[in-house]
Structure formats: structure tokens, C-alpha cells
A protein has these predicted regions:
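Metal-dependent polysaccharide deacetylase catalytic core of the NodB/CE4 family, i.e.
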Residues: 55-57, 62-149, 227, 285-287
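Active-site beta->alpha N-cap acidic-glycine motif
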Residues: 1-87, 91, 309
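A structural motif corresponding to the C-terminal end of an alpha-helix
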Residues: 39-55, 83-94, 131-139, 207-218, ...
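Short catalytic/ligand-binding loop motif for oxyanion handling, primarily in non-cytosolic enzymes
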Residues: 18-21, 66-70, 103-107, 149-154, ...
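Hydrophobic faces of well-ordered beta-strands that scaffold small-molecule active sites
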Residues: 9-13, 57-59, 95-98, 141-143, ...
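Active-site-adjacent pocket scaffolds in enzyme catalytic domains
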Residues: 145-276
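C-terminal domain-boundary segment and adjacent tail
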Residues: 242-342
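Well-ordered, non-membrane alpha-helical segments in soluble/globular domains
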Residues: 29-44, 74-82, 121-126, 257-269, ...
Length: 342
């Protein structure tokens, strides 16, 4: 057992355009990414002064066919904002991949998240890993697939391409309804209900199951999640029992920095108190830091949740880490902590 009492925090910022099913002719700006660069660059000094440790973020880039077709090259987010990337690398941040499976369908005159087409999904991965290698002259270690989605075949493909850490899986998460029309997706979400909440090496036959016999290969580092049962007044509870019973059931809450404070704090405290080796994986879309917001409370929540983290009683134990640094701190990479047993 590793006696290190440091608590790693992996801060994943998904670097994306300011939209989803974007216009190929009139490309959306990446104002959110520009805002994220400003915000997290300024935040870094505060984190380091508060925790007493260097702060390293994980920037997860869209280097995929939608970006290539819309902006002229899969490498565009890196080459267009090269000074940002240089700054991140200088400060020890992780450059990771965040591919989506958007495919342009002429008949629909729209993009489709073609998650049900494994050949296309593999193509998206290969494009991203190839672009990454050209840009950085090394293999990408860390990735998290888009649209809350991953599959066994996709993790196996990423491993073949050289990935060491996957940060996609959100334990307990089951989305019953997509944010956009169902016909814009070619596959349902996987069932994350029984996925471990601590890092594990996945079975090559079923990514949701740990394979404790594996001694090498990719690690799944689950995003931090928990279940929250929201409380309502007696009359409101009665109404919900009749008209919307799902609303009084426990809900899965992800440590997304843009989430409302109550759910974020409850899950954070539960994780810190229950995991054998506590760690946090927080996520955020870059567009939350921009101007074209679908929910104007998102940046307010982000700042309040960051304040909560940095005013926490355990803050001196927090270390904002890359995936590899976090796994080393927790003892997984040197074999002092068993994997996939929670």
C-alpha cells in the first residue's frame, strides 16, 4: 500500500469549437478555448500558491474529421493556437486527445455522431493519433472519447495506437435522452452502471470489467462521479411521484466544473471519504469559458466549484496532476496498489 497522502486532481479541459453540429461553411470560432487559456493560466499561480505544488492540467484536443473538414486540417487547434500549446507544455501540462465521431451526411445536410460504425470510429482515432504524432513527435498517452461514449473495440484500438490512459468512462452514468435529436447518433450510450470508480486495466473482451491478471496495457481512469438524491418538500415530492417519478430517484452527478455547486460538492466529499486511494477527475468543455453560452450559469458554477476545491480543508494534499503523474502518486504504476478491486 502506498503511504503517500497526496490526492491527485486530474483537470480535463476538452478543447472544442463553440458548438456541436457545426456549420462547415461558416466555421464557429473557438472563443471558449481562448477564454479557457486565459482563465486557467491565471488560475495556475493561485493553485500553486494554495496547494504548495506545481499545477498541471490535461488539455484534450479535437483532432478529428469534423475539425479537419471544417477548419482545413485536423491539426488546426494546435497550429492555429501554437503559442497556447507552447505555454502549456512549458508548464508541464498534458496534451491529450478528445476525438468525436462526427461524420457529414449529405442526405441529412448535417453531422451524425457515427458511433455505431466502428470502422469510422477507428478512422477518427487514427486521424487524431497520427496528427498528434506529427505535431509533437511522440505518441499520445492520454485520451477521452467524446459524447460520453466509449466501447471495448474503441479502447482496444486506442491501446494499439499507443494510448496508456483512457479518461472517458463515467461510472453510474446512463443518459436516457440525448441533448440533440436521436437520429443524429448511430449508437446508444454504453451502460456505465457497474464500472469501477477507481483505475483499472480493462478486459479486452469487455471494457467495463477489470482484468486483474493483466500486467501491462492501457489503464481506464474513471471520471469522478457519484449518486445524489435531491430532497424536495412534501407536496413537491408527491407531485413528482405522480408526474415525474424519475426526478426523485438518485441521480448520477459528474464532477463537471460547470455543474451546480450542491451536486458537485456532495460528490467530491463522498469520493474523498470513500475511495481507498482518493483522487478526482474533473472535466470541463472549453466553451464554458467563452461568450456564446447556452447556459450563462455555467461559468459562475465553474468559479464557485474551483473556489470550493481551493478552500477545502485537504487543499495542501491536493496535487493538480497529469494522468501519468496521478497514477504514479497513487501507486498504480509501480505496483504498490492493486488495480480494479473496488
Amino acid at each position: 500500500m502506498n503511504c503517500d497522502n497526496r490526492i491527485p486532481i486530474i483537470m480535463c479541459i476538452d478543447v472544442e469549437p463553440d458548438g456541436f453540429f457545426i456549420d462547415r461553411i461558416k466555421p464557429l470560432p473557438w472563443n471558449g478555448y481562448e477564454g479557457a487559456h486565459r482563465y486557467f493560466s491565471e488560475l495556475r499561480k493561485r493553485i500553486e500558491e494554495t496547494t504548495g505544488s506545481p499545477a498541471h492540467y490535461t488539455w484534450c484536443y479535437r483532432l478529428d474529421p469534423q475539425v479537419a473538414e471544417t477548419y482545413g486540417s485536423a491539426e488546426w487547434p494546435i497550429t492555429h493556437y501554437s503559442k497556447f500549446t507552447e505555454d502549456f507544455i512549458k508548464n508541464g501540462d498534458e496534451m491529450a486527445l478528445h476525438p468525436h465521431a462526427y461524420r457529414w451526411i449529405e442526405k441529412k445536410q448535417n453531422w451524425v455522431e457515427d458511433l455505431g460504425n466502428q470502422e469510422w470510429v477507428n478512422h477518427c482515432l487514427e486521424m487524431g493519433f497520427d496528427a498528434y504524432r506529427r505535431l509533437f513527435n511522440r505518441t499520445c498517452e492520454s485520451f477521452r472519447f467524446g459524447a460520453y461514449w466509449i466501447s471495448t473495440e474503441t479502447i482496444n484500438c486506442a491501446e494499439r495506437l499507443g494510448a496508456a490512459f483512457d479518461l472517458t468512462v463515467e461510472p453510474y452514468f446512463k443518459m436516457k435522452k440525448r441533448f440533440f435529436a436521436a437520429e443524429l447518433y448511430s449508437a446508444p450510450l454504453p451502460d456505465y452502471d457497474h464500472v469501477p470508480r477507481e483505475p483499472y486495466r480493462p478486459s479486452r473482451a469487455d471494457f467495463t470489467r477489470p482484468d486483474v491478471t493483466r500486467k501491462d496495457g492501457i489503464w481506464v481512469i474513471p471520471v469522478s462521479t457519484g449518486k445524489i438524491k435531491y430532497q424536495f418538500g412534501r407536496l413537491e415530492t408527491l407531485k413528482k411521484r405522480i408526474f415525474s417519478p424519475d426526478e426523485i430517484k438518485p441521480r448520477t452527478v459528474t464532477l463537471n466544473l460547470s455543474r451546480g455547486m450542491n451536486g458537485f460538492r456532495s460528490v467530491m466529499e463522498e469520493l474523498l471519504g470513500s475511495l481507498e486511494k482518493p483522487y478526482l477527475v474533473c472535466v470541463l468543455r472549453s466553451d464554458v469559458c467563452g461568450e456564446a453560452l447556452s447556459n450563462p450559469t455555467d461559468p459562475v458554477n465553474m468559479r464557485q466549484n474551483v473556489d470550493y476545491i481551493l478552500n477545502h480543508p485537504l487543499v495542501k494534499q491536493f496535487v493538480f496532476s497529469t494522468p501519468r503523474e496521478a497514477m504514479s502518486t497513487m501507486g498504480y504504476l509501480n505496483g504498490t496498489l492493486a488495480a480494479g478491486v473496488s
